[in-house]
């Protein structure tokens, strides 16, 4: 029997990232490969109490189907927090709750793009966005950055050359580089985007995890034509197992997204939404975020210190002010995948570069994550990687 699968499914390429993740799942492996939050950061006891409050209250509503836009009190809480942290001017009418921000990526690509359309992404970019957009079978154009954000001259050139339907960026502590866009670059970017009237996805999963400096405003602050769709998530500041994210956008976009949501999965789990909102109302979210910041900052500092102490000077890296990642650049004669194979033999792993690019020929970069290991383990793992690097640079 010949089973015929859809074109988007047939177009999915096998990624050996999954094979790498299987290898690093070994119990004695030091893994800097994942982008997971630390399990000790989850407020498990508080979640237990919030769950009891929900079930002892209106359990029927919590266990029933819910509205496709999401639980209204949670949408209100998200809008208020965004207004305070990233200086937006949202109400609940600007918010739609998603099953994690990954669903938001899928929905927004479906909203704006057809097969063969052009999407601009940073070079490098978040691999989860690339894979989500691939399901719509779009074409990618990569825009390089300079440590302050997208290079504006390259952005303008791409917009003048291509019929661009969508732009995807991570402005705060980007995955994989850890770089944050400056305030000035955000303003320059939106000035150009508003001129060409192209929708923008501003993905911000790590924005609250700032270890020094001040929070920077969302692109919506500089958006004069309501083109920005902001993606947020509770996965890094609450618990990823709840699968709660959101899209913040102008009411027209939200109206269209609501139709998409109704036809995709009816709604995000009402029970998860109500437990999260009950937790927000009964516990100190700000204090919880600060505890996560304290934990991750110490681990980031430990990794940066170990890199500076052990890595050969030919290997450079970023210095993130927040988030979860450090991006390393090898001398061009080295390939990160070859280095990874040798590192795995020494029971330490990272993610090589290829998954973060839509173009070929990017082989001398790798991403390190510091959120899931204690400081002693981080130091040990970095020293193991350094030994491999030194051997390959002799």
Which residues make up each language-model segment?
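PLP-dependent enzyme catalytic core of the Aspartate aminotransferase-like
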Residues: 1, 345, 358-394
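Short hydrophobic/aromatic beta-strand micro-patches
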Residues: 248, 327-329, 369-371
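Glycine-centered flexible beta-alpha turn that most often forms the glycine-rich phosphate-binding loop
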Residues: 203
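Conserved core of the PLP fold type I
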Residues: 61-197, 207-225, 296, 376, ...
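Short, conserved charged micro-motifs
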Residues: 334-339, 376-380
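Conserved glycine-rich beta-strand-loop-beta hairpin in the small C-terminal domain of fold type I
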Residues: 277, 294-304, 316-329, 339
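Conserved core segment of the aminotransferase class I/II
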Residues: 224-294
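N-terminal small-domain helix-loop-helix segment of the aminotransferase-like
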Residues: 10-100, 107, 281-282, 349, ...
């Amino acid at each position: 029997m010949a089973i015929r699968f859809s074109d988007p499914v047939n177009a999915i390429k096998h990624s050996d990232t999954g094979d790498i993740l299987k290898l690093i799942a070994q119990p004695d492996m030091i893994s800097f490969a994942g982008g997971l939050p630390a399990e000790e950061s989850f407020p498990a006891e508080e979640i237990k109490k919030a769950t009891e409050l929900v079930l002892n209250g209106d359990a029927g509503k919590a266990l029933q189907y819910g509205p496709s836009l999401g639980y209204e009190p949670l949408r209100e809480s998200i809008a208020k927090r965004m207004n305070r942290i990233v200086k937006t001017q949202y109400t609940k009418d600007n918010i739609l709750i998603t099953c994690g921000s990954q669903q938001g990526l899928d929905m927004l690509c479906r909203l704006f793009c057809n097969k063969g359309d052009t999407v601009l992404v940073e070079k490098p970019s978040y691999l989860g966005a690339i894979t989500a957009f691939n399901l719509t079978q779009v074409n990618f154009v990569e825009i390089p950055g300079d440590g302050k954000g997208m290079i504006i001259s390259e952005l303008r050139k791409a917009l003048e050359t291509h019929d661009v339907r969508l732009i995807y960026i991570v402005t705060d502590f980007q995955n994989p580089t850890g770089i944050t866009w400056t305030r000035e670059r955000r303003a320059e970017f939106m000035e150009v985007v508003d001129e060409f009237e192209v929708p923008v996805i501003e993905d911000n999963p790590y924005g609250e995890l700032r270890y020094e400096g001040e929070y920077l405003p969302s692109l919506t602050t500089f958006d004069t034509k309501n083109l920005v769709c902001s993606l947020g998530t509770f996965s890094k500041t609450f618990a990823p197992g709840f699968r709660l994210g959101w899209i913040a956008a102008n009411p027209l976009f939200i109206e269209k997204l609501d139709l998409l949501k109704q036809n995709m999965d009816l709604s995000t789990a009402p029970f998860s939404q109500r437990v999260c909102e009950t937790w927000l109302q009964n516990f100190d979210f700000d204090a919880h975020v600060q505890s996560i910041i304290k934990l991750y900052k110490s681990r980031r500092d430990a990794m940066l210190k170990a890199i500076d102490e052990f890595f050969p000077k030919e290997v450079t890296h970023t210095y993130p002010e927040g988030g979860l990642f450090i991006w390393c650049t090898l001398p061009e004669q080295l390939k990160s995948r070859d280095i990874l194979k040798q590192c795995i033999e020494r029971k330490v792993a990272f993610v090589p570069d290829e998954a973060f690019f839509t173009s070929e020929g990017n082989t001398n970069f790798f991403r390190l994550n510091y959120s899931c290991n204690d400081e002693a383990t981080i130091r040990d793992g970095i020293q193991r990687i350094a030994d491999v690097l030194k051997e390959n640079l002799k």
